Design a protein with these regions (language model features):
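Sec-exported extracytoplasmic/periplasmic mature domains
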Residues: 28-31, 54, 103-104, 116-120, ...
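Generic structural signal for hydrophobic core residues of well-folded globular domains
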Residues: 69-72, 102-105, 134, 190
Length: 253
């Protein structure tokens, strides 16, 4: 993404990891289509790509993608970089993949803290939709979106004074879907719903409440909504209730 473009070495590592994920995704699609020849080719491509791991050069986005591609152990990545300095180094688009990598390391509580700190800072500044870009350092001594600054103000304008690349200043979009990573992360790792077969004919429900007291949500499927409710009991255990359409096979994790 744009914010990672200043780190070419890390960017190379991230693109390589993405290519691995693409080949694995293609293998899965071709298997679903019963095209064994193309599935085998995609599998071989992924195997060849995974024989080399590029250095991430301190880029959290690249290391997160390497975790998701199976190139790097999730817990080692957390200890080395992903668990350090809070949300410094996050970006709106690839922040989702950092959250996923944290989920794979069983650090849902830390990931939720990151959501509060990074996306929560946008809310504190008046956001009503997801922003195209955001750096946590912008939040220091800046105005809210609906605040009119006097000419002699010592504050910065959160909209007009930041942004970059092709979206400097007021060209910076304050309604950008690519920054909505917390939404799927909450479905996948807190509610814990993940498809196991194409078309959601079979799904895994393996919730993790993290440091939340409760969570409730729905996940859409071709057969209707899966509904899940999680609540922490006084003894620390988590009560899980769910319902799923009859045509969906549910596996509890």
């Amino acid at each position: 993404d744009w914010p990672s473009s200043t780190n070419p070495e890390g960017q190379r590592a991230g693109v390589h990891a993405l290519f691995c994920l693409v080949c694995e995704g293609c293998e899965e699609i071709f298997n679903a289509l019963s095209d064994k020849e193309e599935a085998n080719f995609a599998h071989l491509c992924a195997e060849q790509l995974k024989k080399h791991v590029y250095p991430h050069n301190g880029l959290k986005q690249a290391l997160a993608l390497q975790v998701l591609a199976g190139l790097v152990d999730a817990n080692e990545a957390f200890d080395e970089l992903l668990g350090k300095d809070g949300v410094h180094g996050f970006s709106t688009f690839l922040g989702y993949y950092i959250l996923k990598a944290l989920g794979q390391a069983d650090r849902v509580d830390f990931a939720l803290d990151c959501v509060r700190e990074y996306w929560g800072a946008m809310l504190d500044l008046g956001a009503t939709t997801f922003w195209e870009d955001f750096d946590i350092n912008w939040a220091k001594n800046c105005s809210k979106l609906d605040e009119i600054l006097p000419e002699d103000s010592q504050k910065t304008d959160i909209h007009g004074d930041f942004g970059g690349y092709c979206y400097e200043g007021y060209r910076h979009s304050l309604c950008h879907g690519w920054a909505s990573g917390p939404a799927p992360f909450l479905m996948e790792y807190v509610l814990g719903v993940k498809p196991l077969e194409e078309g959601c004919k079979k799904v895994l429900i393996s919730p993790s409440l993290g440091n939340l007291e409760y969570a409730k949500g729905t996940v859409p499927t071709p057969y209707g909504l899966i509904k899940i409710s999680l609540k922490r009991e006084t003894d620390g255990s988590v009560k899980t209730e769910f319902s799923a359409p009859a045509k969906i096979e549910v596996v509890l994790g």
